[in-house]
Amino acid sequence: MAVLQVLHIPDERLRKVAEPVKEVNAEIQRIVDDMFDTMYAEEGIGLAATQVDIHQRIIVIDVSENREEQLVLINPEMLEKDGETGIEEGCLSIPEQRALVPRAEKVKIRALDRDGKPFELEADGLLAICIQHEMDHLVGKLFIDYLSPLKQQRIRQKVEKLDRLRSRA
């Protein structure tokens, strides 16, 4: 298992549309394990494969306080959305920045688990928001895309400055 490098904006690889996973095999399971290691190391609650430069439809999520409720979504499909909500979202690809993003309050999805078995899931609250956020990554969309151009520019400038400071350290 390994911690992978998380891409940061303005990296254009974050805009790539992920391809469906053709077969859930040992290689995909290794990617899932590495993604969980990376997500936990970065103190995130969700990670899409796109964020670690793997352009396949794979998401890992754990919104639990004790980090013991791993959720794997391979080839996720949105079946239903209901209601309206929003929280200040953050993103491992947009470090130390947060913004209020409109989301559906409840979602119903279909996906494959880490063993390739299909399942459906209904979610609300933080889990529903996280699922929507990570599914956006699979189509090259970031939470800042929901913001005004001015807010997008300010966030990009802050992240670029932060990355410059980190690269000097």
Curated annotation (Swiss-Prot):
Top-level enzyme category? hydrolase
Q: Cross-referenced Gene3D superfamilies, in alphabetical order?
A: Peptide deformylase (3.90.45.10)
Query: Key word Protein biosynthesis present in the record?
Result: yes
* Cofactor binding: number and manner: Binds 1 Fe(2+) ion.
Q: Which UniProt keywords apply?
A: Hydrolase, Iron, Metal-binding, Protein biosynthesis
Residues reported in the UniProt entry to bind Fe cation: C91, H133, H137
Output the CDD domains linked to this UniProt entry.
Pep_deformylase
Record flagged with keyword Hydrolase:
yes
Record EC number = 3.5.1.88
- Known InterPro entries for this protein? Peptide_deformylase, Peptide_deformylase_sf
Q: Which SUPFAM superfamilies match?
A: Peptide deformylase
Listed Pfam families? Pep_deformylase (PF01327)
The cofactors it requires, by name, are: Fe(2+)
GO BP terms: co-translational protein modification; translation
Q: Which reaction does it catalyse?
A: N-terminal N-formyl-L-methionyl-[peptide] + H2O = N-terminal L-methionyl-[peptide] + formate
Q: Name one GO molecular function term.
A: peptide deformylase activity
Q: Where is the active site?
A: E134
Q: What does this protein do?
A: Removes the formyl group from the N-terminal Met of newly synthesized proteins. Requires at least a dipeptide for an efficient rate of reaction. N-terminal L-methionine is a prerequisite for activity but the enzyme has broad specificity at other positions.
Recorded family membership: Belongs to the polypeptide deformylase family.
Name-wise, this protein is Peptide deformylase
Q: Which organism is it from?
A: Klebsiella pneumoniae subsp. pneumoniae (strain ATCC 700721 / MGH 78578)
